[in-house]
A protein has these predicted regions:
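Short secondary-structure junctions and interdomain/linker hinges
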Residues: 70-73, 172, 194
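Short glycine/threonine-rich loop-to-helix capping motif typified by GTGT followed
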Residues: 88-94, 129-141, 170-184
């Protein structure tokens, strides 16, 4: 089974999940084996556009409930790559990512959702800079710290402590003048994320 990942407008995430579930059912696919993500990011609007997103908890809860139809799909996204592409330090990107993940867990458990189910539906999207060893350390630290954060919510299953990560090479350090240097940077970034 191939993993399918979708980025869509936040206002259409719930609808896309329904479309995907109906499509997979129509094709006779085993929904337990379908893997992927629909990246609903409640923090994108304030971070990227500078606009408030007051009803994000209700919207995230609705997306999470719709995501129950696709057990193998991650539907909540923590897009820390915005910081990487803006030139943030690795420690800043990691700190914000973990804070966002914790905020998702805290707010969604406050409205009655199960911490285990919420944690299993979160996917972290990190940016990778060309600082090879620090990026390797970032991923190791992120996995360990996320497990500690989720464990504080007393999940029913320890499998909820597992961090689901997607990495993408940085756009911040690329140059328009030398494509070959960009290839070397991207190779180093990809190796550190592997």
């Amino acid at each position: 089974c191939v993993e399918l990942n979708f980025n869509t407008c936040n206002c259409k995430a719930e609808m896309l999940i329904g479309i995907l579930a109906d499509y997979f059912k129509g094709k006779g696919a085993d929904l337990e084996k379908c893997k992927g993500s629909v990246n609903y990011d409640p923090f994108k609007k304030p971070l990227v556009k500078g606009k408030e997103n007051e009803d994000w908890v209700e919207a995230a809860a609705a997306v999470l409930k719709a995501g129950a139809a696709l057990p193998g799909y991650k539907v909540l996204a923590v897009n820390a790559f915005y910081f990487n592409n803006a030139g943030a330090y690795i420690s800043q990107e990691l700190g914000y990512a973990l804070a966002w993940g914790n905020e998702l867990l805290a707010k969604l458990t406050e409205v009655g959702l199960d911490a285990t189910e919420v944690a299993k539906k979160i996917k972290f999207n990190f940016g990778i800079s060309s600082n090879y060893f620090m990026e390797i350390a970032k991923f190791r630290a992120a996995r360990w710290l996320w497990a500690e954060i989720v464990a504080a919510y007393n999940p029913a299953c320890q499998c909820a402590c597992k961090m689901h990560v997607h990495a993408q090479t940085s756009e911040w350090n690329m140059t328009v003048y030398d494509a070959h240097v960009n290839l070397l940077r991207s190779q180093t970034e990809a190796m550190s994320a592997a």
